[in-house]
Amino acid sequence: GSVCDGTGWTPRHILLEQDGVPIAAMPLYLKNHSSGEYVFDHSWANAYHQHGIQYYPKLVTAIPFTPVTGPRIGIANEINPDLIEQVLLKNIKSLAKKWGASSWHILFPRYGLLNSIFSQSLMKRVGVQYHWKNHNYNNFDDFICTFASRKRKNLLKERRKSTENINITRLVGEEITADWWEFMCSVYHQTYLKRNGTHGYLTHK
């Protein structure tokens, strides 16, 4: 698989129970690299190395290969989320020490969880993402009508050129044969090989 010991994502997920009943869970991985996170901390790893300190392994709470903000702790409806977050965050430091991890990183958490993190004297690292937002456009024409005439004309010209001699077929469910999956994997791996000399994050499995 793509997320396992063999790919450097060793599962260490946390489950909280009350009287034998699960009430909360948090994804957690012990990692020996920084790939697949879309948060680039290689400069931190280099700084650790230059000072003779081990940066890996590290603990990471994240949805692998998904740079999207969202919940990172699943909590039962009847349970106080603030209490659960405090319990998990208080114990994460001891778990990092137990497993020999240099640090714990929670990637793209929801904003409410950030307040709990700050209360535990943990550091915040701010990144920047650029998002396109739909300002009540009903279709693509509505969107490009907001462009200046010259830019709109150039965009339409570029779109026409990009689709010349190209046929697009949409496949769903059982229409996607093993051969198509094999082709998709080969294209995926070739793209990464051209980009950075690796095979990418996802495996055939």
What name fits each language-model region?
Residues 41-86:
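A gly/proline- and charged-residue-enriched helix-loop-helix capping module
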Residues 1-55, 93-205:
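A conserved beta-strand-loop-helix scaffold within acyl/acetyltransferase catalytic domains
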Residues 87-92:
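Long, well-ordered alpha-helical scaffolding segments within enzyme catalytic domains
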